C-alpha cells in the first residue's frame, strides 16, 4: 500500500493553527503544484463542526482567490481540523499563511454576511442546508486570536 504523507505526520507533535508546506510536485510538462496543510485546530483535541467547516470552505474558496492567483483547491480534512490547499507554482508557508490570515479576517468581520458566501443554494451545493455562518465566524475569530504559525512544531506567528 502506498504511503500517504499526511498519515506519516506525528499529529501529537504539531501546534495548530499553522500552515505547513507538505511538498511540491512537478508534472510531466514541467508544471509545479504545491500542497499545504492549513491546520486550524489542534488534532485530537478539537474539531470544527461540519456546518461551520462547510461555510469556511465555501467562503475561503472565494476569499483566497481574491488574494492570490493559482489556487487549485481548498478542501477540508475528514478529521475536521483544517484543509489541504493546493496551488499552481511554488509558494512559501509564510506567503500562504498571510493569505489565510487576511481571508479569515474578512470572514470574521461584521461586514461579511450570507451574501458573501458563495454556493449556498440548493442548485449550487450538495448539502446546502448544512452551513453555519455564525460558526464559521466564531471559528475564524478563535483561529486568529491564537495566531497562524508558519511552522507546525514551533510557534512562529505571522
UniProtKB/Swiss-Prot annotation:
<protein>
    <recommendedName>
        <fullName>S-ribosylhomocysteine lyase</fullName>
        <ecNumber>4.4.1.21</ecNumber>
    </recommendedName>
</protein>
<comment type="function">
    <text>Involved in the synthesis of autoinducer 2 (AI-2) which is secreted by bacteria and is used to communicate both the cell density and the metabolic potential of the environment. The regulation of gene expression in response to changes in cell density is called quorum sensing. Catalyzes the transformation of S-ribosylhomocysteine (RHC) to homocysteine (HC) and 4,5-dihydroxy-2,3-pentadione (DPD).</text>
</comment>
<comment type="similarity">
    <text>Belongs to the LuxS family.</text>
</comment>
<feature type="binding site">
    <location>
        <position position="54"/>
    </location>
    <ligand>
        <name>Fe cation</name>
    </ligand>
</feature>
<feature type="binding site">
    <location>
        <position position="125"/>
    </location>
    <ligand>
        <name>Fe cation</name>
    </ligand>
</feature>
<dbReference type="GO" id="GO:0043768">
    <property type="term" value="F:S-ribosylhomocysteine lyase activity"/>
</dbReference>
<feature type="binding site">
    <location>
        <position position="58"/>
    </location>
    <ligand>
        <name>Fe cation</name>
    </ligand>
</feature>
<dbReference type="InterPro" id="IPR037005">
    <property type="entry name" value="LuxS_sf"/>
</dbReference>
<dbReference type="InterPro" id="IPR011249">
    <property type="entry name" value="Metalloenz_LuxS/M16"/>
</dbReference>
<comment type="subunit">
    <text>Homodimer.</text>
</comment>
<dbReference type="GO" id="GO:0005506">
    <property type="term" value="F:iron ion binding"/>
</dbReference>
<dbReference type="GO" id="GO:0009372">
    <property type="term" value="P:quorum sensing"/>
</dbReference>
<keyword id="KW-0456">Lyase</keyword>
<keyword id="KW-0408">Iron</keyword>
<dbReference type="Pfam" id="PF02664">
    <property type="entry name" value="LuxS"/>
</dbReference>
<keyword id="KW-0071">Autoinducer synthesis</keyword>
<dbReference type="InterPro" id="IPR003815">
    <property type="entry name" value="S-ribosylhomocysteinase"/>
</dbReference>
<keyword id="KW-0479">Metal-binding</keyword>
<keyword id="KW-0673">Quorum sensing</keyword>
Amino acid at each position: 500500500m502506498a504511503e500517504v504523507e499526511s498519515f506519516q505526520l506525528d499529529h501529537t507533535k504539531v501546534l495548530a493553527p499553522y500552515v505547513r508546506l507538505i511538498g511540491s510536485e512537478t508534472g510531466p510538462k514541467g508544471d509545479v503544484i504545491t500542497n499545504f496543510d492549513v491546520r486550524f485546530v489542534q488534532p485530537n483535541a478539537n474539531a470544527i463542526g461540519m456546518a461551520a467547516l462547510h461555510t469556511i470552505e465555501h467562503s475561503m474558496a472565494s476569499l483566497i482567490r481574491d488574494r492570490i492567483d493559482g489556487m487549485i483547491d481548498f478542501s477540508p480534512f475528514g478529521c475536521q481540523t483544517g484543509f489541504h490547499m493546493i496551488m499552481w507554482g511554488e509558494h512559501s508557508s509564510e506567503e500562504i499563511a498571510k493569505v489565510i490570515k487576511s481571508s479569515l479576517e474578512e470572514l470574521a468581520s461584521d461586514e461579511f454576511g450570507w451574501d458573501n458566501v458563495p454556493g449556498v443554494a440548493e442548485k449550487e451545493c450538495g448539502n446546502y442546508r448544512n452551513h453555519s455562518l455564525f460558526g464559521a465566524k466564531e471559528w475564524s475569530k478563535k483561529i486568529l486570536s491564537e495566531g497562524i504559525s508558519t511552522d507546525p512544531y514551533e510557534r512562529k506567528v505571522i
